[in-house]
Curated annotation (Swiss-Prot):
This is Ribosome maturation factor RimP. Its main location: cytoplasm. It holds the Pfam family RimP_N. The keyword Signal does not apply. It comes from the Bacteria.
Length: 153
């Protein structure tokens, strides 16, 4: 099974578990760091994410993973909040944070810049529009390597 198929399969099975515990499944990733593999599950809710919430989701997901055993190699399971400087992966995430400040990291420079920061004004399937100072800047989505919420306390 490909990594993408694994993640999609896990999303379908973990999403109802998270929702049953009053959390939204924000993102899943399976990564190798050094010699270790990590299955990272990010959860969110309107009221924030507590350590106890992460523990509950972790226990429930761990039971599921023990039952279905989808990953042949050894790995560590991590459940956490996406954090204040969260990556915005989907259109749903972008929609939620319209009006907030974001950071766009680019694969290659546009106007000699590889990083743009500004208020998320709008987006569509092809581009993201941000307000930088008083100007609207349009960045093609295929040029964007990473979109991050600019965490502000």
């Amino acid at each position: 099974m490909s990594k993408h198929s694994l993640i999609e399969n896990l999303k379908k099975q973990i999403e109802p578990i998270a929702e049953g515990l009053d959390y939204e499944l924000y993102h899943i990733e399976f990564v190798k760091e050094g010699k270790e593999n990590y299955l990272r599950i990010y959860i969110d809710s309107e009221n924030g994410v507590s350590l106890e919430g992460c523990e509950k989701v972790s226990r429930a997901v761990s039971e599921l993973l023990d039952d279905i055993d989808p990953i042949q190699e050894s790995y560590y399971l991590e459940v956490s909040s996406p954090g204040i400087d969260r990556v915005l992966y989907t259109d749903k995430h972008l929609q939620k944070y319209k009006g907030y400040n974001i950071v766009l990291n680019l694969y290659s420079p546009i106007d000699k810049k590889k990083k743009y920061e500004g208020e998320l004004v709008d987006f569509n399937e092809n581009e993201i529009n941000i307000k930088v100072e008083e100007n609207i800047v349009t960045i093609p989505r295929e040029k964007i390597s990473k979109t991050t919420l600019k965490g502000e306390l």
